[in-house]
Structure formats: C-alpha cells, structure tokens
Amino acid sequence: MSSTLREASKDTLQAENKTYHYYSLPLAAKELGDISRLPKSLKVLLENLLRWQDGESVTEEDIHALAGWLKSAHADREIAYRPARVLMQDFTGVPAVVDLAAMREAVKRLGGDTTKVNPLSPVDLVIDHSVTVDHFGDDDAFEENVRLEMERNHERYVFLRWGQQAFSRFSVVPPGTGICHQVNLEYLGKAVWSELQDKEWVAYPDTLVGTDSHTTMINGLGVLGWGVGGIEAEAAMLGQPVSMLIPDVVGFKLTGKLSEGITATDLVLTVTQMLRKHGVVGKFVEFYGDGLDTLPLADRATIANMAPEYGATCGFFPIDDVTLEYMRLSGRSDDQVALVEAYAKAQGMWRQPGDEPVFTSTLELDMSSVEASLAGPKRPQDRVALGDVPKAFAASTELELNTAQKDRQSVDYVLNGHQYQLPDGAVVIAAITSCTNTSNPSVLMAAGLLAKKAVTLGLKRQPWVKASLAPGSKVVSDYLAQARLTPYLDELGFNLVGYGCTTCIGNSGPLPDPIEQAIKKGDLTVGAVLSGNRNFEGRIHPLVKTNWLASPPLVVAYALAGNMNINLATDPLGHDRKGDPVYLKDIWPSGQEIARAVEQVSTDMFRKEYAEVFEGTDEWKSIKVEASDTYGWQFDSTYIRSSPFFEEMEAQPKPVQDIQGARILAMLGDSVTTDHISPAGSIKADSPAGRYLQNHGVERRDFNSYGSRRGNHEVMMRGTFANIRIRNEMVPGVEGGMTRHLPGSEVISIYDAAMRYQQEGTPLAVIAGKEYGSGSSRDWAAKGPRLLGIRVVIAESFERIHRSNLIGMGILPLEFPQGVTRKTLGLSGEERLDVEDLTGLKPGATVPVRLTRADGSQEVISCRCRIDTATELTYYQHGGILHYVIRNMLH
C-alpha cells in the first residue's frame, strides 16, 4: 500500500501485558495539525481512513479533508468508510441472505467464482422480529408464542440454518434470545476491536452498520454504528465501503440531573423533540457536558437508540469511566476492558470532564427541567406532558378525520362470561416492549415496583387492556425475579410473552374478538401505550388509531386507568379495597427504591445468559439442512423465493435510459414512513398480498406478517404502499393502497395499477412532501417500488437511509426546488413526467423535470438530484449497488 500517513502513524500500546499495534491519531497529527478538538465520533472516522489508506478508495487528501473539518466545522467531501462488522435482524436478514444466494447464482451464470460471494467481515444475525403476541396474560403465554413462532417460521429458519453453513463469518443468534440491539449492547459490542493480522495483534475502534435503524443504540457504548438498508449492508459485508459525505456534527450538551420521579424515557422524548426541531437529518449528534458524569450507560443507550426518531445518523456518547463500569457489569473480560481504556486514552477518544470539542452547532439541556412525558398520537417527536395527554388525544387528527362530529358511545361486550362496556379512548394495548427501554434496569424496576404497590392496594388492570412484557434479553427476567417483582407484573397481566420486538414493530397480535368487534361496531378511537420508539399510524395494530410512547411504569399505570381521557397527573387510576381513590403519585416508586432494586443486577446474570448465546433451543438445533454452496429453491414456497433483481443482468451495465411519459402512481403528503411504503405488520385477506397467499393455499390464520414474508418478492411487491393508513392524494377521502389508473378514473389497488402500467410500457413516478421515507431502514421500501416499475421519486425532502436505499435499487431521488411543492404546482396526479439526459447526470446537479398536464400544457421545474456522491452515481448507473458489486467480482 502506498500509505505514507498510514505507515507513519503506526504505533504500539500495552494493555494487561499484551502489545497491540494501532494507527495513532497523535502521530498522524504531526502532519495533519492539531486535531485534539475534533469531535470524538469524527476521530473514529479519521482512524478508519488512516487504517484503510490505499491511495485509491482512501487517499491522503481524504484524510486531510477530514482533519481539516475543524477549520469550519464542515467539509464537502465524500469518503469511503469501512465498518468492522455488520448486525442484522431476521426481517431484513432473510431477504439479505436471499439476495446473497441469488448473487451466487448470478455470478455463476456470468462465469465468475461463487466463493467470492462471502462476507469479508463478521456478520451477526439476531432472530428477534418474528415472535408475535398471540397469547398474553397467563403463565403459558411465553411457551405458546414460541411454539407458534417456530411453527409459522420453520421454512425461514431452515433457510437461515442453510445460510449459517453456506457463508463464512456469518453467525445466527436463535429465536427466543433477545432483541438484536440489546444483545449487541450487552454482549456483541466490544468498544475496541482486536484481531491478528500478519502475526500482530491490531487494535481499532469497534464500528458497524446494521440492517435496522435502531442500530444506533450501540452509540451509547462509544461504538460508532448506524442503520443502513439491507442492500447497503450486503455490499458492506462483501467488502464494499460505505460511501458517505463527511458529516456535520451537532453537539448536545447535557447538564444537571433528572429530578425525582423522572425517567430516561422522559429524557429521550425531550431530546428527540429538541433535535427534530433543530434539524439533524444526515448529521452526527455527539453528547457532551458534565451531565454525562452521572448519566448511566443504560440511559445513554436509550437516548442513542432513538437517533432515527430525531433524524440523525447517530447519537454518539464517547468512551469514559461509565462505559468501563458497564462493560464490567455486563461480563466483558478484564483484558477487553483494559484494552478499551488504554486505546481510547491513547487516541484522544476518551471523554475527559470539561471536554468541549468543536461542533457545527450546539444545543443544551438541563436535565432537571425534564418533565413526565409521552409522545403521540402518531409521531415520536410529538412529546406531550403527562397532564396534557387527554387534551392531545381529543385534538388528534384521527378524531377529526373520522366521524368526529358524532358522540361516540361506549359499546357493550362480553368477555370470559362477563359483560363490560368499552369506552371511546380505551387503552386496548399496554406493552412493555422494545430495546429502547427494556435494556434499562431503572425503568423496568420502576415498572415492577409500581405494579407491586398497585397490587398491594388492590388495583387491577382494566379488562379490555391487552398487557404484555417482552424484554430485549433474558437478563431482564433474571433481575426482575431476583428483585421479587415478577409476581406483581404477572398479577396485572404483564406476563412474559417473548424475548423479541413484538408490539414495537407491529407484532402485537390480535385483540380478543369481542374487543375487536366492539371497536368496529362503535367506530371507537382507541389507544395503545407502549415503551417503544415508534408510534406511526397503523403500525401497532390496524384498529388502534392513536399510539403513545411512554416509560414502562407509565405503561403499567395506563393499563390500570384503561383510558386516554383520564389525566394521570390529577385523576385517580382506580380505587383501593376500601373504595378510596388511588393516584399515580401514591404508587410511583421513589428514586431510592429504584436504586435499591437496580443493585440486584449482577455480572453473573449476563455471563449465565450469554454463555451459549448461539446455541438455541432443542427445536432450533433439530433443524437439519444439507450443506451446499447454492440454495435449492422450492417452487411452491410462499416464504422464500429467488430474488428477481439479477435475472436479466449482463456483465456490463447498459446506459441509463431517460424517463419519458411517466405516470404518477401515488401523490403523498409529509412524513410518509417506510412503514407506509412497505408495511411490516398484518396482511389483510382482501389485499393483493392476501389474495396471492390464498391462491397459493395459505389459510388466513397462517398469513403471518409482511415482515416475515420479505424473502418472497411476490408478496412484497403486492404489499408495497399497502399500509391501511396511507393516503394517496389522487384518491381523496380513501385510506389504504389505492390509486387511479390513468388516463381513466377507475380506482384500483396500487399493485394492480402498476401491473397495468407495466403491460403498457409506462414508467412510474411517486410525488411526496417532506421527510419522505422516515422510520425503519426498510430496504423493501425501495425494492418494492423498483419491482412496481417506479423510476423516480420527487419529494420536498428525504430521510437519510431511504434516499440511500432508493439509489441502491436504481431509483432516482429528486428534490423539489426550495418553496416549490406539489401544492404550489397545483398537481392533480394526472400529469405526465419527462426526466431526460440521465446519462450526463452529476451528483447534486439540477435536473429539469417536464410536467405535461391533462390539458396538454407544459411546465419545467428544476429539481435537485439527491444522488449526493460520485460512488452513489456509479451504483445508480449500474442499476443498483448489488449489480455493481457482482460486476466487480467478475473483473
């Protein structure tokens, strides 16, 4: 390697009497100049460039550009970043392995070496997205849900077992173990990585990309990582660097301490609201300030977890004493902890009290000002003070959209032989769920202590509330049991339902039939309260119109109150055995009580639960597969089908064709999420995907979810834009994935319209508002549109991961000029679009788009090409990132 800076910076350090080689930033600074005030997150990127300098993908100019960021706290330069490893969950992991298997076949067909389709860096896939809350509220719930999960997903799990033996450096954490981000935080994350290279131990920062947007949770451990689409992760594991612009870094200063009774959840909802308002899309956020001295690592992880909700690429907490304390608690070895400390201090990556790096911009929060909060009814950044929730519920747009004028009456229903009344505003789901909060002992112990006080006073969960507890790791069950709090949670219906994502990703399972019927009969607006990180409309359950994010103790409190109209700050939750009112303040645990309970968490719990993390149950071990390099696709499978994206691929890319006469398939508003574009939850029987499954002999009870069927493109393309809450402005007043087939006026499903347009040879476009593609790092939100024939998406702004995914699938993202929108243009959706001269496209260039209206009049608008880097342009010209990777393997 021609690597003067690289070679000049090579040095050694000692940790626990072991010598490690590393690429020293202080040595590099002799040529680069003083970099001591560079944000710690950028120091991680700088080391990455230094270590990978080869004169081609990483040049000396790249390294100087990153070091020179300090001059203006900004740099307009593309860099090639190579993460140390890749993390996956099964909803995104299964289609990724499908792609890898199909890539092997494509390489073989084109005369290449199939063994090149193998991960070059470690890949951990954690199965956590498949368990559904079918059973709840009793001691058998966990076993029943696990049994159903294995039954429904057997075919997918066989496929993943095949992948385990077919691909090197590919590990699978079996179902029933935990949530990938929590397993990453508690076990997989190293903070500093070390490996043997040419008989030398080399140390470098632990970095990763993950196929789930909440990969950022690991930033709480001082590990730089973020979510990417599955296709980008596949490219990364095959050795392709992640192309990125050197980011702006927003400094978030935390001071003071949380007040008595305020939780980490209240803090993260406040931080999310502040950062959304500030505007951090595509930027790094780095936390600093004396508030970090006493902020537990679990609280840091909670804040880092929600980076996608505040819009940032990551929410980074530098390594310090709190990091080391957590690593010891969670069972990391003494050698590892010593290496982390020595390395971070040697590299200037260690957080010292009083550190004030240079930032692009800054915010500050005195944590003592944080108040008890929820977020809702349908966006994580919409924080509401606890006392204002009834007002926010009443004002929610869902109430206005629906038949709001009529006074909704309570509906009688019979459940288990008893008659009840289901009121409007009922809380029908109360779920302690999600890696965001179940990785945090203080809020879980608070929930258990609140449950204990409630049960002692004789309070009960309201009969219409479906309650559940789904921890992100088995350690949670151990410490709740050790603190003797499990029986009280069980008494209120918060029995263990599984170790996985469950309600947070829409796997809330069915509501009891009498409740579902009562909601439909009374057209009731009901709510879900969950300790999750997302509350987008239609995500948690199709019949639940408002979703509220809250801390675990507040989830328990809402299960007792049972209604969003009750003001938990002033109204009683219920009555004790004497008939006296009981208020939230009467059962809220003190800080001292919570601290005493948290002392029950021990290193032995972590070591016990992670000793055999890759082993799995007997049922998992009994899945046998034949060893083979290529997969034997089953023609009649409704779960796993060969990926169609490489079928007609040739060894050389064809020139990009201009887009002429494109029809608008959908015209959408602001904050359209990847869940709107490609839902993960339940499949309706009368939807195109539901009809496809029934035509292939699948009964409704076996539909499973869209997420579980991502290995079958036939289901997924039919499920594109099929969210029941999506609103296409081309069909006013209609909810769900419908559109008009133009030039006629017939209203049909988006899938059926797209297939007609394909037969007619008509390219397609999508028009949208701000924040298009926010939410999950869902690559099917780009793969599905590609299969429908969408060539271009024109929006007011894009969220980071989705923009990248569109390019990765060969779809052109264009941004309206400032001040121009679909509304200012008066678009009806009947226009035709021409986008020409695509062979001469340049990153960030102005692209003329010609609109031809129904009356024949024309208008040209100058859109901005959101292909931001030269590397992204190369991917687009190849028809997608994986096509580029395959062609590279052939040469």
PLM regions: where:
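Acidic/polar, glycine-rich intrinsically disordered N-terminal extensions of enzymes
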Residues: 1-82, 124, 619-621, 628, ...
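Long, structured ligand/cofactor-binding scaffold of large enzymes
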Residues: 54-257, 264-269, 372-375, 394-494, ...
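Terminal amphipathic helices with adjacent charged low-complexity linkers/tails
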Residues: 82, 100-156, 286-287, 292-404, ...
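Mobile "lid/hinge" segments at catalytic clefts and subdomain interfaces of large enzymes
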Residues: 199-344, 350, 443-463, 495-609, ...
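Extracellular/luminal Protease-associated
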Residues: 288-295, 533, 754-755, 759-799
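Acidic, glycine-rich flexible loop/linker segments
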Residues: 576-591, 803-875
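Segments forming glycine/polar-rich beta-alpha architectures that bind adenosine-containing cofactors
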Residues: 628-702
